[in-house]
């Protein structure tokens, strides 16, 4: 999995890309000129303490790892956790996040 690392890459996607909302997350995406997709994961301090933010990012990475073959190439994608995600982190299962992200990705036509 290729990740977005530079601040300029994130800013480019925020400013020029599209966004779609889910119950627990939102995605920003934009076409790139590469032969592969790149991903960025964000969980701000509004979501919760460090252990909560890290768990959220691990769940996002796991979703991408399992579904990378379904995702169209040539996209830069940022997945951002909503505050609601952090509030319910102890009650949420991977299946809930998977269902939410599947819906968001299908609506955005990335899958």
Curated annotation (Swiss-Prot):
- Which stretches are transmembrane? none
The UniProt entry, under InterPro entries, shows:
Ribosomal_Su5_D2-typ_SF, Ribsml_uS5_D2-typ_fold_subgr, RNase_P
Q: Report which reactions are catalysed by this protein.
A: Endonucleolytic cleavage of RNA, removing 5'-extranucleotides from tRNA precursor
Q: Name one GO cellular component term.
A: ribonuclease P complex
Q: Name one GO biological process term.
A: tRNA 3'-end processing
EC id: 3.1.26.5
Task: Supply the alphabetized keyword list.
Answer: Endonuclease, Hydrolase, Nuclease, RNA-binding, tRNA processing
Which top EC class applies here?
hydrolase
Gene3D superfamilies (UniProt xref): 3.30.230.10
Family affiliation: Belongs to the RnpA family.
On subunit structure and binding partners, the annotation says:
Consists of a catalytic RNA component (M1 or rnpB) and a protein subunit.
What PANTHER family does the record point to?
Answer: RIBONUCLEASE P PROTEIN COMPONENT
Its biological purpose:
RNaseP catalyzes the removal of the 5'-leader sequence from pre-tRNA to produce the mature 5'-terminus. It can also cleave other RNA substrates such as 4.5S RNA. The protein component plays an auxiliary but essential role in vivo by binding to the 5'-leader sequence and broadening the substrate specificity of the ribozyme.
What is the protein name stated in its UniProt record?
Answer: Ribonuclease P protein component
């Amino acid at each position: 999995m290729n990740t977005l690392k530079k601040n300029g890459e994130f800013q480019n996607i925020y400013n020029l890309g599209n966004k779609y909302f889910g119950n627990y997350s939102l995605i920003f995406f934009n076409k790139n000129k590469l032969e592969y997709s790149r991903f960025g994961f964000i969980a701000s301090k509004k979501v919760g303490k460090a252990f909560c933010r890290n768990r959220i990012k691990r769940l996002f990475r796991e979703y991408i790892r399992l579904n990378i073959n379904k995702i169209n190439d040539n996209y830069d994608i940022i997945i951002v956790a909503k505050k609601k995600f952090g509030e319910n982190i102890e009650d949420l299962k991977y299946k809930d996040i998977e269902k939410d992200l599947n819906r968001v990705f299908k609506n955005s036509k990335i899958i």
